[in-house]
């Protein structure tokens, strides 16, 4: 019995120490964390020249809402796909995005500037036209594609764990402004992981004394971060696909084809033999 009581005391102390971590959480703002896809994006080989790209709308096409029992009209995925795509294009050295989502606001400001210039309106330079139009959107959000867990309880002492995996699917297309031809189209997915760990004690120490304690931990990947990573992955795959099809050129072909990031993404889309043959072609 003494060993059991000692075990319970140790369990309660560990639970209290875990709970004390909540006191260290502070509400603060910071830059969005960067994932592996971001470093792949900036690690691609240099292009022969940056292409001007326009993004009018990159929206949520799933039409899904959060599965909450109470009345709630919050969408399951963020509605900020256009902003994430523009950021990813800007972070890459391959594209120069131009503002199109807020085009009306931009035109209004230009009218104000032109009115102030009076007779010297010609000094206001014209807007840059795009070479490539980026289309697509968030095309699917699948919930509970994998679920599971494990647990055990003995004499009122036990622990359990659960996990759930959702999936976000993004489609990105590059269209030639001059001809309307589809230069590249890629579809990427990103898993959204949620997990929960719990442990508890419910045991009578003697006839009139009951010990009850529980501790738990839940972790949910931010959906907004997963959307951003799926879009970054789509941009990297699109650049790699364009190089594969020779739709756009590398600054240095010999050096660029040896880039590890480029070869990694080629191997995701093609077999080893095809990639080796493409590398031999130069």
Q: How would you describe each model-predicted region?
A:
Residues 152-158, 209:
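Flexible, solvent-exposed loop segments that connect beta-strands
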Residues 147-152, 198-201:
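Outer-membrane beta-barrel translocator domains and adjoining extracellular loop/strand segments
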Residues 49-52, 56-144, 167-184, 274, ...:
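N-terminal segment of the mature soluble domain
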Residues 12-15:
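C-terminal motif of bacterial Sec signal peptides marking the signal peptidase cleavage site
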Residues 17-49, 162-282:
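C-terminal/domain-edge helix-coil "capping" segments
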Residues 6-8:
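Sec-dependent N-terminal signal peptides
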Residues 1-4:
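Positively charged n-region of N-terminal signal peptides that target proteins for export
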Residues 121-122, 156-160:
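Extracellular loop and loop/strand-boundary signature of outer-membrane beta-barrel proteins
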């Amino acid at each position: 019995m003494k060993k059991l009581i000692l075990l319970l005391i140790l369990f309660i102390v560990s639970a209290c120490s875990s709970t004390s971590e909540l006191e260290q959480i502070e509400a603060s703002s910071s830059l969005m964390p960067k994932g592996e896809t971001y470093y792949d994006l900036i690690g691609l080989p240099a292009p022969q020249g940056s292409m001007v790209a326009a993004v009018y709308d990159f929206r949520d096409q799933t039409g899904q809402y959060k599965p909450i029992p109470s009345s709630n009209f919050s969408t399951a995925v963020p509605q900020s796909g256009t902003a994430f795509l523009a950021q990813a294009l800007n972070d890459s050295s391959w594209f120069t995005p131009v503002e199109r989502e807020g085009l009306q606001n931009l035109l209004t400001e230009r009218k104000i500037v032109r009115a102030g210039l009076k007779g010297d309106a010609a000094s206001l330079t014209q807007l840059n036209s795009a070479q490539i139009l980026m289309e697509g959107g968030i095309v699917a959000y699948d919930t509970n594609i994998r679920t599971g867990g494990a647990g055990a309880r003995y004499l009122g002492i036990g622990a359990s764990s659960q996990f759930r995996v959702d999936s976000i699917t993004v489609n990105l297309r590059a269209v030639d402004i001059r001809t309307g031809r589809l230069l590249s189209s890629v579809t990427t997915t990103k898993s959204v992981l949620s997990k929960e760990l719990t442990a508890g004690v419910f045991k009578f120490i003697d006839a009139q004394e009951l010990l009850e304690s529980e501790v738990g931990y839940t972790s949910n990947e931010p959906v907004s971060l997963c959307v951003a990573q799926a879009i970054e992955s789509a941009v990297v795959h699109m650049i790699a696909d364009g190089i594969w099809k020779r739709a756009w050129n590398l600054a240095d072909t010999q050096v660029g084809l040896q880039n590890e990031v480029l070869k990694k993404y080629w191997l995701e889309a093609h077999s080893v033999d095809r990639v080796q043959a493409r590398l031999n072609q130069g």
